[in-house]
Swiss-Prot record:
Its EC number is 6.1.1.3. Binds 1 zinc ion per subunit. Belongs to the class-II aminoacyl-tRNA synthetase family. NCBIfam families: thrS. It comes from the Bacteria. The keyword Repeat does not apply. It catalyses: tRNA(Thr) + L-threonine + ATP = L-threonyl-tRNA(Thr) + AMP + diphosphate + H(+). GO terms for cellular component: cytosol. Its main location: cytoplasm. SMART domains: tRNA_SAD. Catalyzes the attachment of threonine to tRNA(Thr) in a two-step reaction: L-threonine is first activated by ATP to form Thr-AMP and then transferred to the acceptor end of tRNA(Thr). Also edits incorrectly charged L-seryl-tRNA(Thr). This is Threonine--tRNA ligase.
Amino acid sequence: MPVITLPDGSQRQYDHAVSVLDVALDIGPGLAKACIAGRVNGELVDASDLIESDAQLAIITAKDAEGLEILRHSCAHLLGHAIKQLWPDTKMAIGPVIDNGFYYDVDINRTLTQEDLDLLEKRMHELADKDYDVIKKKVSWQEARDTFAARGEDYKVAILDENISRDDHPGLYHHEEYVDMCRGPHVPNMRFCHHFKLQKTSGAYWRGDSKNKMLQRIYGTAWSDKKQLNAYLQRLEEAAKRDHRKIGKQLDLYHMQEEAPGMVFWHNDGWTIFRELETFVRMKLKEYQYQEVKGPFMMDRVLWEKTGHWENYAEHMFTTSSENREYCIKPMNCPGHVQIFNQGLKSYRDLPLRMAEFGSCHRNEPSGALHGLMRVRGFTQDDAHIFCTEEQVRDEVNSCIKMVYDMYSTFGFEKIVVKLSTRPEKRIGSDDLWTRAEDDLAAALTENGIPFDYQPGEGAFYGPKIEFTLHDCLDRAWQCGTVQLDFSLPGRLSASYIGENNDRQVPVMIHRAILGSMERFIGILTEEYAGFFPTWLAPVQVVVMNITDSQSDYVQQVTKKLQDAGIRAKADLRNEKIGFKIREHTLRRVPYMLVCGDKEVESGKIAVRTRRGKDLGSLDVNVVVDQLLAEIRSRSLHQLEE
């Protein structure tokens, strides 16, 4: 006689085993109709699964995050159903859920085109519109293997042979004549899977191994209603317009080429943005009392063995050798900073010691994962490490948090999601040490009035951490900032200081990054601003233009005055119509265009126009210089009179 306890604390008793759907129906027909699955004692189960003993139950609907994920997973099965009807010889590999959608890897004897995707999507809609029931059957390992062997599904057979225990009972999900294998749960009926869109295809090696066969990966998105689907597709359309790779080419910021995969060739205008960003960070480092250091970009492998990186991270490290010694090109800056700390005897009076670097790092990312500035092999970290005592941890974390929000607000990021990752099962250090560290991080967030979620068990083995995730104008999440405590690395590299009692103690190390990778952050900003960088960041801040040759000398005088004031200005004296020049520089997203005609020459003024098309009228040149300097120095996100 199971007693079912619901989230509101109410209970329902039954004299026989009941399914999740039975309980939902008992509560009300509306909930039964919306029921996708259940969470029984914290574990997700199918709506058809039986509950045989006392349990805590939550009904999962499409409004829940888990419900949407289940719906997307079932759309992957729907894709399998449709593709097997259209091209029966296709062999199905894996079809998991990903952010905002799903994919399925398939082995098919044709190169899928956009026309094929349209045909496939149409068949998926035809099948989903039948609102058929999805039937789950738990079978023996052998029965599952026989089922897929008979259907010629070699990849499913391989999964069973290599990944699933012979004692297990896999779940087979029947979509009419189509059968797929999954841990589940899945939707009970295809009425939940009406709002989807197939997006693109790509190549993918079986099991991610380039030695295996190349499959075709079909990507799709799915949502619980049409409004959400359309909103997402609109966001994708807007994201495509803002793609930093496209804008980077339009604005001549940088390029990449095959001879240096994942490495950035910065052009003049892109490097101007980089240096301006670097200047801003330097100003903040001075304000928050950091030293700036510079470590070598490669060090002997022996050092990386001491840190544990060689054991755990070697596949991501580039190496080289010279004179019978092997060197690793650094993937991160922390070991180098410990070496600097170790030079000379340190006292507790020297702590906290805040050490920052614009560190040039390299990581051997898979070529298929590289993506413009967002995922590169060579990058610059705005990295810092704070060496302090245990008693100083809270104050230092507090300062890091203030610095994070101070810097993010300059760029206009207002929605920041914060997570605190706590001790994992495998860790170093005593429970007391972890408790104090976690409490210090939580207290620092609370003192700053910052809401956060815990991520239990997600901390590194050497300490808990805070993660800061930015949400941009399209509500995309970018994890950039981290504050990570480290109880391990200083000890591994023999870092110590003389304590108040004249004994040697190991400092606590705080890893702190705010922008993360400078390259990636510039990519994020490019998409956030759609290339319309605020004036202080814009590569060219002002273009001064003549209407006819008679104003050329005046244009050059005005341009020099702006340049002498420290404004990035250039003159456009080309023999082109003024409308053509304005259009060209507007497309280049230059913040201000100053136009000189005979009237401006006579009056000593200048006609001011913004890249958004706003005419500010004719203004005195000195007034323009002063106003522009005020906007630039304040790092305003807004132009004059906005």
